Amino acid sequence: MTDTTFRHEPSHSQPLIDAHHHFWALDGQVAYPWLEESPVEDFFLGDYAAIRRPFVAADLKRLVPEGFRLVGSVHCEAEAARSQALEETRWITQQQATHALPSAHVGWAAFGTDECAAQLDDQRDSPLFRGVRAKPVTAATPRTRQSVAGTSGSLQDPRWCEGLALLTDRDLSWDLRVPAWHLEEAATALQDYPDLRVILNHCGLPWDRTPEGLAEWRDGMQALAANPNVAVKLSELGSPWHDWEASANGELLCEVLDIFGAQRCLFASNFPVSGLKVSYDGWLSLVISAIEQMTSADLRQSTLDKVLHDNAIHWYRLPIAGITHDAAITHDANPTRHARQEAP
């Protein structure tokens, strides 16, 4: 593991919401083929044997360093067997009832199929369900991007993009996860869905750290940031082609904060996956270090409160009180509002 831990000593117990993590019990209730069957070849972080074991709420709580209080979290679908999207949502809802985590769940649905609407509506029975992470077909490298242009399941596929309309109709959000060479394409696709709430995963996945690759990443991030309904998670800067370096990744975090502004950045760990490269404390401290570099002293604490806590409340409409009480920071005090309703 490559890890450099930056030490942050808060003057008080800092409330924290982790806006992206995964749970799995591997006990037969929900199947995870990538964890329980043959390992996936070319996993983007390399050998992942260390996470092929249960990771549940108690494990996440133990990772939070002294000086911080984990007051909520957002669970993101964890590549469960695709026939078990509803089972995963139900299992996560049971975990919250027992362990008080997570505060919200981002599920999955089969975009581009006749079953998508029903899958969304069934999951809306859970008071935790806020939206889905459905991944479009993407190219494996920047050089091969044209190989998927216009193909079924891609961002140019009108049938697949009907899923985005279904989310909008149901007031659900979309967790967007594509590598950097598809960011501008995603920004273009979203122009047809101006009311859709979107949360970009993992800093836009700047896997290609060449000058050309980073230039394309910046262009894509700026294109998405031009849409006021897009936020970004400060999470997962591991790359399949470059070593994990704290200093370089800290610079990328600063760029994300500059492009999107602190109001649209959410702290997120992507644990346990990110734990293959960095400790929880190390990642949290790296995010805080970037915030401190990008913020004047008089605004530092309020900015920390936004990125580490309040922004997750706003973007995922969590039933948790905010800290900064800015007009733009709101929360839904009635989480059952997101329970199943008849589709319009």
PLM-predicted stretches and their roles:
Residues 2-19, 28-63, 255, 259-266, ...:
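Mid-to-C-terminal alpha-helical segments outside catalytic/metal-binding sites
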Residues 4, 83-181, 188, 233-238:
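Active-site gating/metal-coordination segments in enzymes
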Residues 16-26, 200-203:
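Histidine-centered catalytic micro-motifs
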Residues 20, 73, 105, 132, ...:
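Conserved, mostly hydrophobic/aromatic
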Residues 25-72, 127-153, 196-197, 228-231, ...:
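Active-site gating loops and adjacent loop-to-helix segments of metal-dependent hydrolytic enzymes
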Residues 51, 79-86, 109-117, 178-184, ...:
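Acidic-and-aromatic substrate-binding clefts and catalytic sites of carbohydrate-active enzymes
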Residues 59-64, 88-95, 116-123, 159-166, ...:
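A general structural detector for well-ordered alpha-helical segments in enzyme core domains, enriched
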Residues 150-266:
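Catalytic pocket-lining loop regions of alpha/beta-barrel enzymes
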